[in-house]
Amino acid sequence: MVTSPLRAFPADGYTVRWQRWHHDGDETLNLRWENEGWTATGEVGHEAVTYVIRLSATWQVRQFLLFRDLDEPDLWLGTDGSGRWGELNGAHRPDIDGCVDIHLGCTPFTTTLPIRRLKLEEGDSVALTVAHIDVETLGVTPVDHVYVRTANRRWRHIDESGATTDFDVDEYGLVRDVPERFRRH
């Protein structure tokens, strides 16, 4: 079955908000087009963090910045687009080489990255190794995730422990609700 394509984001940007499932925090995400790519800025209230993800026009991660309690980023990672990662100071991060996407557990937005980038058809799946970022410790580790497009706007995510989550996306590929975790508002 041919799947309908995702809608292009408005050129002047897009804002979406999620709330924690049990109303104990929220997130505001702003997407804007600049310098021939997308910049996603998320403010996650329940974690007291702000993240910035700079993406290519084809939704490949180029840079990731995480701010907690400083004006300067607590963590700043960059990739060459071929799976080689490093830090702002130029230090190579071979421990996460090969990862194309990143995963932050405090936001549903990072789930959108492979959805937008891969353009899977209904019934297709892909196994990816992603760079998982722990916002408390600033640890970055490679973890395996599987994404399955089960219907036009329905997906299944299987994490490294085998836990399965089904969720719906909107016309842009942004997660609507993740049961027991996040809901759009």
Short names for language-model regions:
Residues 2-26, 74-155:
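Solvent-exposed helix/loop surface patches that form functional interfaces
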Residues 25-29, 49-53, 72-76, 163-166, ...:
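A structural detector for short beta-strand units
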Residues 44-46, 157-161:
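Short loop/turn motifs at secondary-structure junctions and domain boundaries
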Residues 8-53:
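N-terminal ordered "arm"
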Residues 44-89:
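Hydrophobic/aromatic-rich structural module bridging two neighboring secondary-structure elements via a short loop
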Residues 159-185:
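C-terminal structured interaction module
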Residues 33-38, 54-61, 79-82, 150-153, ...:
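Short, solvent-exposed coil/turn segments at beta-strand boundaries
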